[in-house]
Amino acid sequence: MPTINQLIRKERKKVIRKTKSPALLECPQRRGVCTRVYTTTPKKPNSALRKVAKVKLTSKVEVISYIPGEGHNLQEHSIVLVRGGRVKDLPGVKYHIIRGALDTAGVAKRNVSRSKYGAKKAKAGGDKK
């Protein structure tokens, strides 16, 4: 605990919090345009072809963002909504594309966790045996 004299000589240091998604500029989401849609491979020990897109945001920053879910309709010049959230096994990917918003279609035939993938509720009675 500092004394009054110590505080007069040198004031308390402000805590500077570093954001994990700086390109969003403190916003929850940002709109952007896809400049390149491609697949990439994850770090060891995982193996897959992860779908990612390079997106130019309205904040004039170009970021690499992950396309979640099975299958997508994105191509160059698609307008997308980007949120924060990294992908642990893809270095440099710190953003996610929101499915079901703007030009991005929701995941087809998705029954669980639908809200995360922009999927509409299936018609009742269509899944009976």
Swiss-Prot record:
Full protein name: Small ribosomal subunit protein uS12
- Pfam families according to UniProt: Ribosom_S12_S23
* Residue numbers bearing the 3-methylthioaspartic acid modification: 89
Query: What family does the database annotate?
Result: Belongs to the universal ribosomal protein uS12 family.
Q: Which UniProt keywords apply?
A: Methylation, Ribonucleoprotein, Ribosomal protein, RNA-binding, rRNA-binding, tRNA-binding
GO terms (BP aspect) = translation
Question: What are the disulphide bonds in this sequence?
Answer: none
Annotated signal sequence is none
Q: Which InterPro entries match?
A: NA-bd_OB-fold, Ribosomal_uS12, Ribosomal_uS12_bac
This protein's GO cellular component annotations are: small ribosomal subunit
